[in-house]
Regions:
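Hydrophobic helical membrane-anchoring modules
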Residues: 1-6, 13-24, 28, 107-110, ...
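Hydrophobic/aromatic residues located in beta-strands of well-ordered beta-sheets
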Residues: 4, 35-37, 61, 91, ...
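Residue-level preference for short helical/loop micro-motifs built around acidic side chains
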Residues: 13-17, 44-48, 72
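Short helix-capping segments at alpha-helix termini
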Residues: 26-31, 54-59, 85
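Short beta-strand/loop segment that forms part of the nucleotide-sugar
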Residues: 31-42, 64
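A conserved acidic beta->alpha catalytic loop
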Residues: 39-48, 98
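Acceptor/aglycone-binding surface of glycosyltransferases and processive sugar-polymer synthases
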Residues: 62-80, 90, 102-191, 222-230, ...
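Short beta-strand-to-loop acidic/aromatic patch adjacent to the donor-nucleotide binding site
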Residues: 85-99
């Protein structure tokens, strides 16, 4: 089964079209699936909208009364996945802001299965990736983050090349490997409360010999609706602290 996991903070205007599009795309693949979405303390119409969408789509809602941050919201989602999924299930993480294209899931799944992967990143920075309308300041921070992580940790793809994109949220995970990490780390498998959880989880999965890779993605930031929730400077400093913690545990 495919478990599509999303975290939403005041994303009602996007969810109204995203959930049907995502659901219809997975249905076209003939796969058994469920969409699980964590509402991270939203104060818009997200909950009522999703409740209505449940009538026509396999949708599970995990509402949080107060905002706890992207990382901890995904920790809630991954805990749900680990506790209530079969080993051969796959989890696909997906952003709610319209920048991820559901039509690329088929290509990602094909590559994942063909190469017997445990973890796949939809990459914005590897060869043949396409990024449109990505703000210069965000591209600089994101690319700089990945370069720092490449030099410190050098996570390797199945080809032996260094992984290029450490922060993309568009990913496929093998649930069996998530359970293995959870058994080792227990409640500490994700400790970062915000965006930097993407780096933390990737590095921890690499350290338990996950078979991982990345695949080019078409990423159109111009399709994004609503104000960005990403606090760039705060997350950059959180990343520096995370790097120190991970280095100590090498």
């Amino acid at each position: 089964m495919l478990k599509i996991i999303l975290c939403a903070l005041n994303e009602a205007q996007n969810l109204q079209t995203l959930i049907p599009n995502l659901s219809n795309e997975i249905k076209s693949l003939g796969a058994d699936f469920k969409i699980i979405i964590c509402i991270d303390g939203s104060n818009d119409e997200s909950f009522s909208l999703l409740t209505d969408l449940q009538k026509n789509h396999p949708l599970e809602i995990l509402p949080l009364k107060n905002e706890i941050g992207l990382g901890l919201a995904y920790k809630r989602l991954f805990t749900e996945i680990v506790n209530n999924s079969a080993d051969d299930d796959l989890a696909i993480s997906f952003d709610c802001d319209n920048t991820h294209n559901p039509e690329q899931i088929a290509k990602m799944l094909n590559y994942f299965h063909k190469n017997s992967l445990d973890f796949l990143v939809a990459s914005r920075f590897c060869n043949k990736s396409v990024i449109e309308d990505f703000p210069i300041h965000r591209k600089f921070i994101t690319k700089t983050t990945s370069l720092i992580l490449q030099n410190l940790f050098a996570v390797k793809r199945i080809s032996g090349e260094k992984l290029q994109d450490y922060t993309s949220g568009y990913r496929i995970y093998r649930v069996k490997k998530l359970k293995e990490l959870f058994a080792i780390q227990k409640n500490n498998f994700i400790t970062e409360p915000e965006f930097t959880y993407t780096c933390e989880l990737l590095i921890k999965l690499a350290r338990i010999n996950s078979r991982l890779d990345e695949i080019p993605i078409s990423y159109d930031y111009g399709k994004k609706n609503g104000k960005s929730k990403l606090r760039i400077l705060r997350n950059f400093w959180r990343l520096m602290i995370l790097l120190l913690k991970l280095q100590v545990r090498l």
